[in-house]
Each structure stands twice: as C-alpha cells, then as structure tokens.
C-alpha cells in the first residue's frame, strides 16, 4: 500500500494504534495487512480478535481474496465456475502462517503468555489486536477504566519491545467525533478512555471515510465515493500526513487508489472448499491457524496461576 511508502514499513518494537468510529473499516484494514504479511511475504502473523470469531474473520479473508460478493459467499449461492475460483484463490490461505486467537475478554497477562508462545514456536513477526478497549488489565486498576486502559496501553508497548515485533492495536474513538461539524475528521484528543494511548503509541493512524457522513466531495472537488483517508496523526519517527486509499466495501479490503478493481470472479470446483473454511474452524474460542491446526496449543491453562507481574 501507499501507506508503506510513508511509514517505511512497520518498525520492530513499534506500537501502532489504528483508530476510527464504527463502520469505517478498522477490521478490514488490519485484516488486509495481516493477509499481505502472511500470504505475500510468508511472515508469521498473530491476530488476537476479541470481538469477531475466527470463523467470521476467515469468511472476510475468503471474500477479500476471491473478490466474490459477500452475500453470495455466505449463502453459498455460487455458480460452479465461481466455486472453482474460490477454491483456487483461497489455496494460499491454507498454508499462510496466520494464527487467529478469538478468546473474548482477554487479559493483558493471558495475551502476553500467548504472544510469547507464538513467538517461540512460530517466530511471529507481527501482532494485531482487535481491539484494545476489549482487553482487561490488572486488579489494581479495576473500577477506573481510564487507568486500566492506560495500563493496557503501556503493557502492550512493553510486550512489543520484549518480543521485538511491531504491534498493531485497534482502538475506539469518542462519540464526540461525530458531534463536531464540518468534515468530522478525527483528532488525537478523540482517542477513547485514555490519553496514555497517544503517549505510548509510536504511530497513531485514523481511518476516515467522508462518504459515510454524506460528504460527497473533498476540499478539491474530487468525489469521495469508495475513498478512505488514512490520517497519520502521530508518527514518532516520521512525518504526519494523510494517505488516500480505495475502500472496497463489498470485498472488505483496502487498495491503493491506482489499483484497478478486481476482475470478475471466475470460480470453485465443489462446495467442499467453502465448507472447510466456513464451518471447519474450531467452534470454541481459542487460537487457530489458517495454515496449521493449533488447537489449544497456545491457550493459557486457567487452572494455573497466571503470571500477572507487570512486564516492565
């Protein structure tokens, strides 16, 4: 993406916060990054999803990879040609080193244990969390949500340094963002529940889609339909600027503006490929791999005492 040319890629030990209001495409954005790292570059990616299940994420990956209609894929209403295309297009996902953990209400201490194991056993190169505000901190901060989020943010940065990997965490924005007039572009002060997030992050990027707010043209008179602005509001080691991307909503993915739309899908031999991805995933929350069956290999045994010492 053009974003890579601005950030010069993700730097080791960086904490990158990607924030936006609902329906801006936060999950699609980081899932696109995870897919590019795991499939195109064969780099290990750990994706901790506290909101969506692994099955839902895999479905999004299939839709983005094939370019097929999301409704058609979910319902299974595909032509034989489309089924052949789906099977062919999703084969790279089957061997991709992408590990998804969908444990809900994950504590930072459980997260640290799982991330360490994934680093040791699978040499992951990047960690993605969706999203920060759904994590829990330590008992000392219970009752004060701002302090708890500050503790979580600080801990995530410490873990990124310990494991020497870039860490991307999705974050919510305050509703006040939408109460402002004008373009309703997000600002650093809109980060929800803690100013510590801004302080701890090396990069803070906002996703903004003017089209969502009924703004049909930008300040230069260009149409905003299908466009997204990635606003680099903080960049510790580089310039702050805006990057325009195309948001392909139907395919739940982002692309460079100059990229053409995907060609019409051709498509898959039998429904077996769909079944393998859509219903063959583990039904219980835990860590699963697209390219390897991981079962509960990296789960924390809740009957044992969790190492809850702050990692810094």
Where are these regions (language model features)?
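Structured core elements
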Residues: 2, 15-19, 29, 46-49, ...
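Short, ordered loop/turn segments at secondary-structure junctions
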Residues: 50-52, 78, 131-132, 172-173, ...
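Short, small/acidic-rich helices and loops at N termini and domain boundaries
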Residues: 24, 43, 67, 142, ...
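Helical hairpin unit composed of two closely spaced alpha helices linked by a short loop
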Residues: 124-170
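P-loop NTPase nucleotide-binding module
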Residues: 4, 8-52, 106, 111-120, ...
